[in-house]
């Protein structure tokens, strides 16, 4: 019924855009240590489909889970939340 709402959505930073129509997004999350209660930072890289090659390195983007598009690509670009500042 509303299966589309069950998909995972992450916000992360683009760390690579060297591939055609593919970006690598670094997603950082915090988890609480089970015994000591300290927040520990975890990070994971996801490859995402960028149809129009619009995301650049340093951009903050939102990605959504989708069907497998290649051997390693299971996410697609939803929107660019914040553009990187070019110096």
From Swiss-Prot:
Coiled-coil stretches: none
Record keywords, A-Z: Ribonucleoprotein, Ribosomal protein, RNA-binding, rRNA-binding
GO cellular component: cytosolic small ribosomal subunit
PROSITE patterns in the record: RIBOSOMAL_S17
Disulfide linkage: none
GO BP annotations listed: translation
Keyword rRNA-binding: yes
GO terms for MF: rRNA binding; structural constituent of ribosome
Substitution effect: residue 16 to G: In strain: 10
Function: One of the primary rRNA binding proteins, it binds specifically to the 5'-end of 16S ribosomal RNA.
PANTHER family named among the record's database cross-references: 40S RIBOSOMAL PROTEIN S11 FAMILY MEMBER, SMALL RIBOSOMAL SUBUNIT PROTEIN US17M
Family: Belongs to the universal ribosomal protein uS17 family.
Subunit structure: Part of the 30S ribosomal subunit.
Name of the molecule in the record: Small ribosomal subunit protein uS17
Species per Swiss-Prot/TrEMBL record: Geobacillus stearothermophilus
Taxonomic classification: Bacteria, Bacillati, Bacillota, Bacilli, Bacillales
